[in-house]
């Protein structure tokens, strides 16, 4: 990205452009996949989810690296679980992610009204209350499988979002998915531009989408409790909230295959300590509260516990 492009995206949001090179043969398989997702967008969810369940069980057997990471994470976070409990959660997780992925076309192209019918909220009053108090809003959103879908759905309910984003390595996928994320007015910001563009849009009234559970290493993090273990956690949420003059409201999206709906649970605004470690621990407590109820909805395949105090690689 050129310096001029960097300045542009810092002001207006990340905006990759279409290139005629995307029609070259090397991209044809991606276009074929996109066509398949578009077709699935109009298939009844029960039929689509049945297909996804079948595929997800196959993926669960084939994706050994991802399965290994999930197993390690669950062993550390839930040492009291039996091996059977961990295996069942992993199997359910792969089914859920496949259901969400096969439904991406629906999220990307169907109408506002359709997406509104396919979603429901609990705790929406916490957002309304913060607005009534004149506060900006930062949503604290752990890595659930339905995280992208919920961001787009919020737009359809008149709640514009802004978020930071790592551009996809494949430029065609990057262009397509950014277009889908922003089609109702959302703003994505490339992480290389820093946090300032994100904060500026929060101050202008967009709700910030903040992911609290990524591991950025020991130098940028503090070690605080996370389930039954500990985690390198970014400590700056209290400072970010202060700079944005925002309430920090935890939110967790789930996909319910029984109803075919995206269920978005919202908690009351957090009371954040001025102490960075206490604020970081409070974030992890919110994650624990959401995930414990439905562990298979969480993205356990991430290297969530990558940074350890003794420098060991638990995923090796």
Summary of predicted features, one role per range:
Residues 99, 133-192, 218-225, 229, ...:
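Catalytic core of membrane glycerolipid acyltransferases/transacylases, capturing the structured
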Residues 2-8, 14-17, 24, 88, ...:
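Non-catalytic C-terminal accessory region of glycerolipid acyltransferases
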Residues 35, 69, 125, 149, ...:
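Short Gly/charged-rich anion-binding patches and loops
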Residues 120, 189, 267:
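General small-molecule cofactor/ligand-binding pocket signal
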Residues 2-141, 174-176, 185:
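Membrane-anchoring hydrophobic helices of lipid-metabolizing enzymes
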């Amino acid at each position: 990205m050129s310096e001029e492009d960097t300045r542009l995206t810092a002001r207006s949001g990340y905006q990759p452009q279409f290139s005629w090179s995307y029609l070259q043969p090397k991209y044809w398989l991606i276009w074929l996949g996109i066509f398949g997702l578009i077709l699935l967008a109009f298939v009844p969810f029960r039929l689509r989810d049945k297909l996804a369940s079948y595929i997800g069980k196959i993926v669960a057997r084939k994706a050994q690296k991802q399965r290994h990471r999930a197993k390690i994470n669950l062993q550390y976070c839930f040492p009291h679980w039996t091996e059977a409990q961990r295996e069942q959660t992993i199997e359910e997780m792969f089914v859920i992610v496949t259901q969400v992925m096969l439904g991406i076309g629906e999220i990307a192209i169907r109408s506002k009204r359709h997406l509104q019918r396919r979603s429901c909220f609990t705790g929406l009053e916490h957002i309304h209350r913060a607005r009534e108090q004149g506060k900006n809003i930062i949503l604290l959103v752990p890595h659930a499988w339905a995280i992208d879908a919920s961001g787009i759905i919020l737009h359809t309910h008149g709640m514009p979002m802004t978020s930071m984003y790592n551009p996809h390595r494949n430029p065609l996928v990057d262009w397509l998915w950014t277009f889908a994320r922003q089609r109702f007015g959302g703003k994505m910001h490339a992480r290389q531009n820093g946090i300032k563009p994100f904060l500026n849009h929060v101050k202008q009234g967009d709700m910030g989408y903040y992911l609290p559970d990524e591991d950025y290493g020991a130098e940028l993090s503090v070690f605080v409790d996370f389930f039954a273990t500990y985690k390198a956690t970014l400590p700056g949420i209290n400072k970010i909230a202060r700079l944005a003059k925002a309430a920090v409201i935890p939110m967790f999206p789930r996909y319910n295959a029984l109803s075919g709906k995206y269920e978005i649970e919202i908690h009351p605004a957090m009371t954040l300590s001025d102490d960075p470690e206490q604020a970081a621990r409070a974030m992890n407590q919110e994650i624990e509260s959401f995930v414990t109820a439905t562990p298979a909805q969480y993205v356990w395949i991430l290297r969530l516990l990558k940074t350890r105090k003794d420098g060991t690689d638990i995923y090796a």
